[in-house]
Swiss-Prot record:
Any one GO molecular function term: DNA binding
Required cofactor names: Zn(2+)
Protein family (similarity comment): Belongs to the NrdR family.
Gene behind the chain: nrdR
Zinc finger (unnamed): 3-34
Taxonomic lineage: Bacteria, Bacillati, Bacillota, Clostridia, Eubacteriales
Function: Negatively regulates transcription of bacterial ribonucleotide reductase nrd genes and operons by binding to NrdR-boxes.
Family annotation (Pfam families): ATP-cone (PF03477), Zn_ribbon_NrdR (PF22811)
Domain ATP-cone: 49-139
Superkingdom classification of source: Bacteria
One of the GO BP terms on file: negative regulation of DNA-templated transcription
Official protein name in the record: Transcriptional repressor NrdR
Cofactor note: Binds 1 zinc ion.
Keyword annotations of the record: ATP-binding, DNA-binding, Metal-binding, Nucleotide-binding, Repressor, Transcription, Transcription regulation, Zinc, Zinc-finger
Length: 158
């Protein structure tokens, strides 16, 4: 590992520990020439996931797009940024665990709606209206009716 201060290529590891999310190893190194310390991270290389858009174009999965969509849907709702990040992390983790290399954008949208339905119905309807491209008020009413019906069925099962 090349020292960022003097460029010398030999160092010793002074400390090594796992990051909080256990996805990387943080190493404190000391240059054997200038004796300065620096930090490096070692992590597993992610397999890039391609998202197949509605128009059949493909682009690399970008978690920030999920976060941005959730932030808009949850605006002025009692949903914390931690919850939003958690939803995005769960979706990314699911795709990585399923070892998907290509995924339709519809699949990601459905996962997001599933999570939103569990935490906030208003945010769910907001997201669904954009994702499913609601054309008029009747589409909103239909979605809300379905949501209320699902909620009623859930109470009966309990």
């Amino acid at each position: 590992m090349k020292c960022p201060y003097c460029g010398f290529e030999e160092s010793k590891v002074v400390d090594s520990r796992s990051t909080e999310d256990h996805k990387a190893i943080r190493r404190r190194r000391e240059c054997l020439k200038c004796n300065r310390r620096y930090t490096t991270y070692e992590k597993i290389e992610d397999i890039p996931v391609l998202v197949i858009k509605r128009d059949s174009n493909r682009e690399y999965f970008d978690k920030t797009k999920i976060i941005n969509g959730l932030v808009k849907a949850c605006q002025k709702r009692p949903i914390s940024r931690v919850q939003i990040d958690s939803i995005a992390d769960e979706i990314e983790k699911k795709m990585n665990n399923d070892m998907l290399t290509e995924v339709k954008s519809e699949y990601i949208g459905e996962l997001i709606m599933e999570k939103l339905k569990e935490i906030d119905e208003v945010s769910y309807v907001r997201f669904a209206s954009v994702y499913r491209q609601f054309k008029d008020i009747n589409t909103f009413i239909e979605e809300i009716t379905n949501l209320m019906s699902d909620k009623h069925i859930g109470k009966i099962k309990k």
